[in-house]
Amino acid sequence: MSEQKAFSLKIDEQNIAWLAIDVPNEKMNTLQAAFADEMKEIFAQLKDTSGVKGMVIHSLKPDNFVAGADVRMLEACTTASEAEALAKQGQELFQQLSDLPYPVVAAIHGPCLGGGLELALACDYRVCTDSDKTRLGLPEVQLGLLPGSGGTQRLPRLIGLLPSLDLILTGKQLRAKKAKKLGVVDACVPETVLLDIAKMHVEKGKKKGKQKQSTKEKLMSGSGLGRKFVFEQAAKKTNEKTRGNYPATVAILEVIQHGLEKGFAQGQELEAKRFGELVMSSESKALRSIFFATTEMKKENGAEAEPTAVNKVGVLGGGLMGAGISHVSVAKAKVPVRIKDVSNDGVLNALNYNYKLFEKQRKRRIISKAGLQSKMLQLSGGIDFTSFNHIDVVIEAVFEDLDLKQAMVADIEANAKPETIFATNTSSLPIHKIAEKAERPENIVGLHYFSPVEKMPLVEVIPHETTSEETISTVVALAKKQGKTPIVVKDKAGFYVNRILAPYMNEAAHILLANEPIEQLDGALLDFGFPVGPITLLDEVGVDIGAKIMPILVNELGERFKGPDVFDTLLNDGRKGRKTGKGFYTYKGKKKEVDKSVYKLLNLTPESKLSDNDIALRCVLPMLNEAVRCLDDGIIRSPRDGDIGAIFGIGFPPFLGGPFCYMDQFGLKELVEKMNEFASKYGDRYAPCDGLLTRAGEGRNFYD
């Protein structure tokens, strides 16, 4: 029996070639270096076949075209030149495709991303289905890379400079209709006629000529002055977002500009060279490690048992968290939701919140008006427990009050099925205390979402000692269907994310009270790579929330969690943060500025004394120390979970790979030295924990 191949070629009776892609034993088609020989054989076969009128490239997978290059092959590269050779191989194969003397059409259904889109761009025409599964894009930048098989050169020549920069610099994915509007594809059709329409493009018998440039495009990319202006502005805007932490964006701008100025061939040459360099960069290695980790986690149940089916979800509480949880349950998990609140106003609030989110999608043409109505019909609510006897999982999102949450457990046990799971969205209360009076404690688990629920990708799954394996695996499966990345953590104060966040925030408060200006403090952590600074974060989360959580951590975990006592002063002055329009900043619409009166309130005279690097390290090192304690205490199951939790839960800089990956890069011996230096200057709170000292002494890394 011959070995199954990824590419197969057939010539039909009308002399049209059909190149089918079907990577053996894989759910998704990905491009691999090993396929190069197959492609060379196919080109040789096409060359030896006379009378071919054209070719259609299509996938035999039911729901994807080509999801990109197989990222795993980059891990085998030990030098930049090896990675550069991979890029050149892809460029050469796609150039051969582009040089065929007859029209070639890509028939696209499902994801067409990265190398998949680069393959399609090398064709004369692209036809895609109007399915919601169809997505087109070049997401390489999200892995710290650039498109390495001609994408940086072909896309700007196809759709123009500005839209290409937007797509390649962000890695955003286009839906089918948007791709048609931008000119990425030539037709957007129902799936049933995809191959017929692709064949029609071949039957036209013409290769696609050079794209005609609009006057605007000629001014922007065709003239030296216009091009210079566009790239200067793009570099400025990109640097504002990345703070110089992502070398891939700099390389993307350089390579596209070089190609437009020096020609396609030289553009591809630089593209391959920069691709090779980026593959070996620490930033790309860290981002790829996150990609591999999340891919791995998608396959895990979180427990030994298989999950049970969840056909209906109940949500207790119609506030911000309850509304967000109900939204991801309907929109992503596609299960009907029943909302219960103490008042009809609470239920209406949750329904209105959902309507606004779906209406945004309708305006962006992501869903139709009928689709919006269909989604809203999946939501219902009331002030009693009507229909809760049909619910599989109840997610509680009421106030942080132990008695109230225990009462909710009793209500659900009285009104739902015996096997109904009770998942509590608490951020500070112990799960075992919430389950203390339960008749069926094995059904109770923590499910800690982050706000806003519809945007934040992480959820902490917190079993207590008697939570069943089936309960754990079921809520892990539900969280994944809601579009979340779940990590299973131990039932201890602060769980994982809040526990490592607390010392970071405390240190920011220490630095502020030493008279460092708020702007510099926040700016230093932005430059380090966090999405927001610590003072802004406190305003966003709410000063009142911080005031509730910190004493719990001090009580449960000890004096090292005791920070400067500023909460009462701020709250007595009505400063709860963004939600009240006043915290450390004042807020008017989307604009914010430092409220200078807060300095007087706290008896401060702001003066910049510390370097940005020292500010950042002073905040980050206590977080790293606590992350190690969490690992050694069994709060998290692995360094991988700790890295993903910190990146997705609090925005730890992705290009650093997470706390544990960053510590390995920093060097544990060097880290211990830095902590000891800070401990001598600022106090014992910087003293490295035992786990860090042991590993540093033994020369071990977290990812050995």
Swiss-Prot record:
Pathway: Lipid metabolism; fatty acid beta-oxidation. It catalyses: a (3S)-3-hydroxyacyl-CoA = a (2E)-enoyl-CoA + H2O; a 4-saturated-(3S)-3-hydroxyacyl-CoA = a (3E)-enoyl-CoA + H2O; a (3S)-3-hydroxyacyl-CoA + NAD(+) = a 3-oxoacyl-CoA + NADH + H(+); (3S)-3-hydroxybutanoyl-CoA = (3R)-3-hydroxybutanoyl-CoA. Keywords: Cytoplasm, Fatty acid metabolism, Isomerase, Lipid degradation, Lipid metabolism, Lyase, Multifunctional enzyme, NAD, Oxidoreductase. Its EC number is 4.2.1.17, 5.1.2.3, 1.1.1.35. One of its GO terms (molecular function) is NAD+ binding. Pfam families: 3HCDH (PF00725), 3HCDH_N (PF02737), ECH_1 (PF00378). GO terms for biological process: fatty acid beta-oxidation. The keyword Oxidoreductase applies. Gene3D superfamilies: 1.10.1040.50, 2-enoyl-CoA Hydratase, Chain A, domain 1, NAD(P)-binding Rossmann-like Domain. The record marks 118, 140 as: Important for catalytic activity. Residues 308-704 are annotated as: 3-hydroxyacyl-CoA dehydrogenase. Residues 1-190 are annotated as: Enoyl-CoA hydratase. Signal peptide: none annotated. The keyword Isomerase applies. It is found in: Cytoplasm. SUPFAM superfamilies: 6-phosphogluconate dehydrogenase C-terminal domain-like, ClpP/crotonase, NAD(P)-binding Rossmann-fold domains. One of its GO terms (cellular component) is cytoplasm. In the N-terminal section; belongs to the enoyl-CoA hydratase/isomerase family. In the central section; belongs to the 3-hydroxyacyl-CoA dehydrogenase family. PANTHER family: TRIFUNCTIONAL ENZYME SUBUNIT ALPHA, TRIFUNCTIONAL ENZYME SUBUNIT ALPHA, MITOCHONDRIAL. Heterotetramer of two alpha chains (FadJ) and two beta chains (FadI). HAMAP family: FadJ (MF_01617). Catalyzes the formation of a hydroxyacyl-CoA by addition of water on enoyl-CoA. Also exhibits 3-hydroxyacyl-CoA epimerase and 3-hydroxyacyl-CoA dehydrogenase activities. This is Fatty acid oxidation complex subunit alpha. It comes from Vibrio campbellii (strain ATCC BAA-1116). The lineage of its organism: Bacteria, Pseudomonadati, Pseudomonadota, Gammaproteobacteria, Vibrionales.
